[in-house]
Design a protein with these regions (language model features):
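Cytosolic regulatory regions of ion transport systems
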Residues: 1-221
Length: 221
């Protein structure tokens, strides 16, 4: 189970509401803030600490306990002035990690300049994931974990079946690290190097962000 932390969400549009619900479902503490009472009322059904306030008011944020949050999320990417103010206020209050939603790359870079530790551009990110999936039907899920590496869940490649990690030597040849295998509804962690891949396995691995370009090579091993 994930460590319990406190997240403050500034902006309760569809993205903010969904995020608040998911974090609450994962037993995390959420402070949900928006100046629109209608949106606050929507999340108050599942978030105990849902507040109607203008988050450009740093004193009001401090009084709401925002300074004790572990992570802040600013979701108002289409309203740049509000997003900038939200990021700056969270940082000034000492929130250690601030994530901001942006509607384009230019806005994302600006939010990073004013203090956001990470930005997300949902439409752009979705398009990238879609393109990767179209290039290789073997990729089930792919999430960037940093600027260089991704976490992937893939269908076991046909040429891997009947072979083990020692034989495939994925780490040395392709810098691919297998961290788990899902088989028959069970998840195998700390995979033994002698464990042979079986048909219908789903493999969890960490690799470079451009690994999808090399799937044809991986399937020829």
């Amino acid at each position: 189970m994930a460590e319990r932390k406190t997240y403050v969400i500034l902006g309760l549009g569809r993205f903010g509401q969904t995020l608040a619900k998911q974090l609450t479902d994962f037993n995390q503490d959420v402070i949900a803030i928006d100046k629109d009472m209608a949106d606050v009322e929507k999340v108050s059904a599942f978030v105990a600490n849902a507040l109607c306030m203008d988050y450009s008011d740093i004193d009001a944020l401090a009084a709401a306990g925002v300074k004790d949050a572990d992570t802040g999320i600013v979701t108002t990417g289409t309203m740049l002035d509000q997003a900038i103010q939200g990021v700056m206020n969270l940082k000034e209050l000492g929130v250690p990690y601030v994530l901001a939603k942006a509607n384009n790359i230019k806005t994302a870079r600006l939010l990073e300049k004013v203090g956001a530790d990470k930005t997300i551009t949902p439409e752009n990110d979705m398009a990238v994931r879609c393109a990767r999936a179209l290039i290789s039907n073997d990729i089930l899920e792919m999430v960037d974990v940093d600027a260089e590496n991704s976490l992937l869940k893939i269908k076991v490649l046909s040429n891997w079946v009947g072979h083990n990690l020692k034989q495939l030597d994925l780490r040395t040849k392709y810098s691919v690290n297998v961290i788990g295998i899902e088989r028959d509804g069970k998840f195998i962690v700390n995979v033994n190097p002698d464990e042979e891949f079986k048909e219908n396995d789903e493999v969890l691995l960490v690799a470079s962000n451009d690994i999808y370009k090399h799937f044809s090579e991986l399937n020829k091993i």
